Regions:
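Interfacial juxtamembrane loops and adjacent helix segments
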Residues: 46-136, 296-303, 323-332
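C-terminal luminal/periplasmic domains and tails of membrane-associated envelope-modifying transferases
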Residues: 433-725
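Membrane-lumen/periplasm interface segments of multi-pass, membrane-embedded glycan/lipid transferases
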Residues: 280-354, 460-469
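Transmembrane alpha-helix segments characteristic
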Residues: 17, 166-168, 354-377
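Transmembrane-helix signature of polytopic, membrane-embedded enzymes
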Residues: 9, 104-122, 126, 150-174, ...
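Membrane-interface transmembrane helices that cradle and orient dolichyl/undecaprenyl
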Residues: 155-159, 198-217, 247
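Perimembrane helix-loop-helix junctions
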Residues: 201-207, 235-269
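Membrane-interface alpha helices of multi-pass inner-membrane proteins
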Residues: 214-230, 235-236, 270
């Protein structure tokens, strides 16, 4: 049936599907959760309220994105101008302090950066939320333009094969990253449209020659694109190449190509040139980015920035397909690996296709300069490993992927296009399910499941625990234990209450804990639905360094942060659900572990002579090591640190005997005494431990590495102790 529909009707159907998906993505994502959306909102509000551009500075760049050109924000401010709302350029929503918990994992656990009230959802009783969504719908319009440009680019390169253009159009329309951009308040949406327009015009000029109208359109696309986001300027290379091509194709066309190219450049400069002049007059930097770049890069040298950029490439790959908001909403690895395999096949097919048309070469060049610009950005400003910086190259990328697949199956083009459209459409729905579940209120439960333990515990009339389930009754250090609690809210509270789950050992020390708002961040107690039971599963990770063997009591409660107290349940401050047997790992040292210090030293175990200590007393710490590739002697430091970061004991000294005298890969132990300050308050403390080289003691610490090689930090929380008088 699809083959009988005209290409234009199929294109219209894809466009309608895109709009529906973009709206769904927008409604699934609460206000301000998208990348830098709060800062883009502040920029638009600054323009609306002050009717002037914000000054360019480090502060305004960080808080308002003031280093970006103003076109998108001016349009958003204009569209929202009839709405009278209090939030201004200093608006700060209530923050979720537990946001980003194990952000790299697919889950719905504290993915929300902010706390959200019902007025942020349709039909938007909040003026701020309505302003956000009006700007998001502006982004959707720009996104639709990108989708149409993908179709146009396909028709330019393959005028006699509309199905290829439709395949590229569908691939762009249903790409979750583009859908997310087109459903968020951000200037990338405008930059993507104008950039993709510039690519299409450049390809048309290279393929069919230049006209005055094409030169004007290309100049407008480049100028408006740069006035949306400066990164679009890299596409001027593709535009210049198009004019060089038509000039070189025939000698008598040089003057003609130069004239049209100059017209294009003058229009672009007339539209966007004033922005660079303003920046230069204000900061001495035409881009207005020098101080902002320095603030982001900090003291990192170029070599470190390059290492960070290279380590961020796997992350960047995931953002090409679907990684939402600040990267915390992620899909299973298999999704990204599947697209990787499909891209390899496309590249093989593309090599066989041997595209040599002028338009194809210009499209290739547009992709190349976009990637080069992105690479330069990644090694200049950290945290820019996101494909939103090259979205304007997506139509060209999609087109070449479809061409590659077609080359492998030339006789199956109609079926191939249908499969491409269907696969990408299903992937967009699959990705939407992860976005939606990250912020959705927990589902209501009519009855407890059979494996849950019924219980009745009332927390001062705010809520009741009606059941629970523990994933295990025995665990080792480093293991994860899931604690599922079935809550029945009884009433909304005046202030948000926090849930805590503590694993308390026989010494009264909290060996592991989770703190979160109910609903894993999405069911704040101020918005609870009374008498609607829901399940919360708290993933509690027992530290690798947890002392074992031990018996851990699982205690759950509600904490009122405004009053700094727990809610009483019965006659206690928490409800004990059960106990877990924490067993020792197998190893040749006490509390076996494998803590990697820069592949130089491995901490394989430790022991304390006691874990409950009085102020002024001495604690004996024995650490067990394996010297893997020591490059010097090392200075070890052990600090007893309170919850507020204050240090109450310091035991810093060179490890003896000197490590350079140790046999390679031989196990050795070292003991040090830690004297607690006499005025140390009672409570629980963390024993922090780390290493530095003797030649630079206390200056450059050895970095702790994870199993996959990424840096964790420059010290570890070795143990928990209690101070009692």
């Amino acid at each position: 049936m699809l083959t009988r529909l005209s290409p234009h009707r199929l294109a219209a159907a894809i466009a309608v599907a895109f709009i529906a998906l973009a709206l769904a993505y927008g409604f699934a994502n609460p206000p301000f959760e998208a990348t830098d959306e709060i800062r883009h909102f502040r920029y638009a509000r600054y323009l609306a309220l002050n009717r002037a551009l914000p000054p360019v500075s480090v502060e305004t760049s960080k808080e308002l994105q003031a280093h970006h050109p103003p076109l998108y924000y001016a349009l958003a401010a204009l569209l929202a101008s009839p709405i009278h709302s209090d939030p201004g350029p200093d608006h700060s929503p209530a923050i979720n302090p537990f946001w980003g918990f194990r952000y790299f994992e697919p889950s719905a656990d504290n993915k929300n950066q902010y706390l959200h009230a019902p007025d942020g959802r349709w039909p938007f009783s909040s003026g701020a939320a309505l302003i956000v969504f009006i700007a998001r719908w502006l982004s959707t319009v720009f996104g639709l333009g990108v989708v149409l440009m993908a179709y146009r680019l396909g028709r330019i390169l393959f005028p006699d094969q509309p199905r290829i253009a439709l395949g590229a159009m569908a691939f762009v329309a249903f790409n979750p990253t583009l859908l997310h951009s087109a459903s968020s308040l951000n200037n990338d949406a405008a930059a993507t449209f104008f950039g993709s327009w510039a690519v299409a015009e450049s390809a048309a000029i290279a393929q069919g020659g230049s006209t005055r109208a094409r030169a004007i359109r290309l100049g407008m696309a480049l100028g408006l694109g740069v006035l949306s986001k400066v990164s679009v300027a890299v596409l001027a290379v593709a535009a210049a190449a198009a004019y060089l091509w038509i000039g070189a194709s025939r000698k008598d066309r040089w003057r003609w190509a130069f004239g049209h190219g100059a017209l294009c450049a003058m229009i672009a400069i007339a539209i966007a040139g004033w922005w660079f002049a303003r920046n230069y007059l204000q900061t001495g930097d035409p881009m207005g980015l020098s101080e902002y770049q320095s603030a982001w890069a900090g003291e990192a040298d170029r070599a470190r920035l390059i290492r960070e950029a290279l380590s961020g490439l796997p992350y960047a790959w995931t953002t090409v397909w679907a990684r939402f908001d600040y990267g915390q909403i992620v899909l299973p690895d298999g999704a990204y690996q599947t697209w990787g395999v499909l891209c390899v096949f496309a590249l093989i097919g593309l090599a066989r296709a041997r595209l040599r048309s002028p338009a194809a070469l210009i499209a290739f060049l547009a992709i190349a300069v976009s990637l080069a610009g992105w690479a330069a950005l990644m090694i200049t400003i950290p945290a820019t490993a996101h494909a939103r910086h090259i979205l304007f190259a997506f139509p060209a990328l999609a087109l070449f992927l479809v061409v590659g697949w077609r080359s492998l199956l030339p006789q199956r083009l109609p079926a191939l296009i249908f499969v491409v459209c269907s696969l990408e459409f299903l992937f967009s729905l699959f990705s939407l399910s992860y976005l939606d579940s990250a912020f959705a209120y927990p589902h209501a439960i009519a009855a407890l499941p059979a494996d849950a333990t019924p219980i009745s515990a009332n927390f001062e009339g705010a809520a009741e625990i009606v059941g629970y389930r523990l994933s295990t009754r025995a665990a080792h250090s480093g293991d994860r234990v899931d604690v599922t609690v079935y809550w029945r809210p009884l009433a909304q509270t005046a202030t948000p209450l926090q849930t805590f789950v503590h694993f308390v050992d026989s010494q009264g020390i909290i060996a592991a804990q989770r703190d979160t708002y109910p609903g894993l961040g999405s069911a704040v107690t101020t918005t609870w639905i009374a008498n609607q039971t829901f399940a919360d599963t708290y993933r509690v990770f027992i530290p690798d360094t947890a002392y074992a063997p031990e018996t851990l009591a699982v205690r759950v409660g509600l904490w009122n942060a405004s009053e700094s107290r727990p809610l009483i349940v019965g006659d206690a401050d928490a409800l004990t659900l059960g106990r877990i047997d924490l067993q020792s790992r197998v190893g040749g040292a006490p509390n076996p572990m494998a803590i990697n210090f820069e592949n130089r030293m491995a901490l394989i175990g430790y022991a304390l002579d006691r874990r409950v200590i009085a102020p002024g007393d001495t604690l004996l710490l024995t650490t067990h090591w394996r010297a893997a590739a020591a490059d010097s002697d090392y200075w070890a430091y052990a600090h007893v640190v309170g919850a507020d970061g204050q240090i109450w004991a310091i035991a810093d000294s060179i490890i003896t005997p000197p490590i350079t005298e140790w046999p390679v890969n031989a196990n050795q132990s070292e003991a040090r005494r830690i004297v607690l300050a006499p005025d140390t308050p009672t409570g629980q403390y963390t024993l922090e431990f780390g290493l530095t080289r003797v030649s630079d003691a206390g200056q450059t610490r050895l970095v702790v590495l994870a199993d996959d090689g990424h840096e964790i930090g420059d010290h570890i929380a070795l143990a928990q102790i209690r101070v009692e008088r």
